[in-house]
Amino acid sequence: RTCNKTFSDQSKICPPGENICYTKTWCDAWCSQRGKRVELGCAATCPKVKAGVEIKCCSTDDCDKFQFGKPR
C-alpha cells in the first residue's frame, strides 16, 4: 500500500501490515489563523480519536489526499 504522509509531497510505501491510509484533522490554539492541523499516514487499523478530532480512513493506494489551503 502507498499513502500520503504529513510533510511530504510524494506518497510513501507503508510498512508491512499497515494497509490503511488515514487523514486526521483537529484544531489547536492557532486554528482560527492557520486552519486545522493535519496528519496523514499509514496504520494497521483506523486510529481511534478523541473528541474534536476528525479521521478518515481508506484502503486504496494514495486515497488519503488532503487539499491544503493557500497561506494568507
From Swiss-Prot:
Disulfide bonds join C3-C21, C14-C42, C27-C31, C46-C57, C58-C63. It holds the Pfam family Toxin_cobra-type. Keywords: Acetylcholine receptor inhibiting toxin, Disulfide bond, Ion channel impairing toxin, Neurotoxin, Postsynaptic neurotoxin, Secreted, Toxin. Coiled coil: none annotated. GO terms for molecular function: acetylcholine receptor inhibitor activity; ion channel regulator activity; toxin activity. It is found in: Secreted. InterPro entries: Snake_3FTx, Snake_toxin-like_sf, Snake_toxin_con_site, Toxin_cobra-type. Its main location: secreted. PROSITE patterns: SNAKE_TOXIN. The keyword Protein biosynthesis does not apply. Expressed by the venom gland. GO terms for cellular component: extracellular region. Gene3D superfamilies: CD59. Binds with high affinity to muscular (alpha-1/CHRNA1) and neuronal (alpha-7/CHRNA7) nicotinic acetylcholine receptor (nAChR) and inhibits acetylcholine from binding to the receptor, thereby impairing neuromuscular and neuronal transmission. Belongs to the three-finger toxin family. Long-chain subfamily. Type II alpha-neurotoxin sub-subfamily. This is Alpha-elapitoxin-Dpp2a. It comes from Dendroaspis polylepis polylepis.
